[in-house]
Every structure is written in structure tokens, then in C-alpha cells.
Amino acid sequence: VVLKEEKHLLIRIPNLKPILLLAFPLLIFPLLTMLSFNVASTPLTWLDKTFVENAFYDVALRHEYAQGNKPLAKWKRPIKIWIDHRVGDEELHQELTELHVQHLAKVTQHPIKIVTRESDANVKWVYTRQSQWIAEAKTVLKLKSTQHLNSAICTAGYRTNSKGEIVYAGIVIPVDQARARGKLVACIVEEITQVLGLPNDSDKAYPSIFNDYTPEDLLSPLDVVLLKLLYEPELKVGMTETKAKPIVRKILKRYSETGVLQQASTEAQQAPLYQLIGY
């Protein structure tokens, strides 16, 4: 497979070792784009219910490099992240991570926290260096092949159980490589966001971190709506698009009537990372 730097790659890796006594596919999402957010110059697509609906199906229920649809996947258990700092600037990386995680927890209303012991975690997040990251990605994500990482900047993956519930995720960011290409923040934001259950890149989602042509590196208002939608209790893990459609439409109608769509821009710009970075 020939990779282009400006595109993402989604690969399903078969025959993985079992987790919780079961073997499930691991989805790998190399982050290959840099993303900054400017509402004034952006189409207000998140206000259009039909646009949001189509974007949701494409981001949550599709695989970029696989045929057909996939069932809905998300976390049901609390997300517990253990961060392994193997390079300098630990304080900076920790702060960037914690600020974005706080925002994700607020947007999704799903419990997400940083833990201090690896044994307590179901997400392993490694900050490393370029010379080590291929080997560490292979270990953290249990990869049999790492060829697809040669043109990637950073990577993440998750596993689901037979019901579609995400039970494990790994993230590996080679800091020197990401910084050299101006994509450290983009790696942090996109990788953890995608392993919440929105794995696919899509031209139908704009502005969005899931769209290669969006110049933003933080969550857009559309991303906020997509995350909220995914973690609505009415949408169950394992749902197909056919089963999800009437529920998605009902929720989006409610969002429009109660101001959720209209408030998405404000909620996106209230992210702690916006305050830190100075957007």
C-alpha cells in the first residue's frame, strides 16, 4: 500500500491475540494531517440536520479502506488513560493531554480520566521518539505488520468485543516527528477522539478533524455534535445504519429544537486547549 502524507489510512488487522479471552480486530488510524479553527470563515454545516446525519454515518459507520458498513462502536465502560512519557517535556505533553481529555468528557458526558497505574488503564498512550515509535506501536497495538506506519506521523487503534463495545485502545505519538511537521497538537486531538468510536475520515464531514482538507487542529462545532450524538444512550453498540437512522434523526430534531446545534460553536471554542493555545 502506498500512503500519501495528506491522507489517513484505516487498516483492519486480522488474527490478533485475544483480549479478555477473545480476539477482535484492531483498527489503526495513522494521523497524517495538521488541523486551527475559525468560525467566521467556515460554513455552518453543523446547523443542517441532514448534513450532520450523513457525516455521522460516514465517520462512525464506515471504513475508509474497506467495503461496506460497520456496526456502531463506542465505550460503555469508563475510559481510563495511562500515559507513558518516554521523552522530555513531560509536563507539556501531560497538560495538552489532560486539557483535551477534559473537553471530551464534557462533550460526551462519558467518564474519561487519567490514571497513574498502567494496570488500571484500558487506554495506553505513549509519548516516544521517532527512532522507537515503530517498535512501540507494534507492541502497544499488537501489530503483525508495521509497513503502513512508514508514512504515518502518529497512530492509534482500538478493539471491540463481540457486541461492538470498545474495550481497549492504544495511542503512540513520536514527539520529535510530530513536532518537526507541526502536528503535535493535531496528533493529540485526533487520535484520542477517533478511538472514542469515530474512526473514519470523510469528505462529508466539514469542518472536522475527520476531514483531511479541514485546516483546523482542534474540535470543530461539527465534531462536537458528532461526539454528542455517538454517546447518546439511545444509540446502542452494534447498531447498523438501518437501525440507527430513525434514532439519529429523532436526536438531531431534538438537538435543533433545544439549541444543541446552535450552541456547538460556543462549546467548541470553550475547549481548554483553545484557551491555552490562544485561538
Where are these regions (language model features)?
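Disordered inhibitory propeptide/activation segment of secreted metzincin zinc metalloprotease zymogens
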Residues: 37-80, 87-89, 108, 153-161, ...
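N-terminal secretory signal peptides that target proteins for export/translocation
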Residues: 1-16
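Residues marking helix boundaries in flexible regions
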Residues: 12-14, 20, 29
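Bacterial N-terminal signal peptides
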Residues: 23-34
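Residue-level signal for short, function-critical loop segments
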Residues: 85-87, 177
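Short, aliphatic-rich beta-strand segments
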Residues: 80-84, 171-173
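Metzincin-family zinc-dependent endopeptidase catalytic domain
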Residues: 93-189, 194-205
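Metalloprotease/metallohydrolase-associated module, dominated by Zn2+-dependent proteases
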Residues: 148-183, 199-279
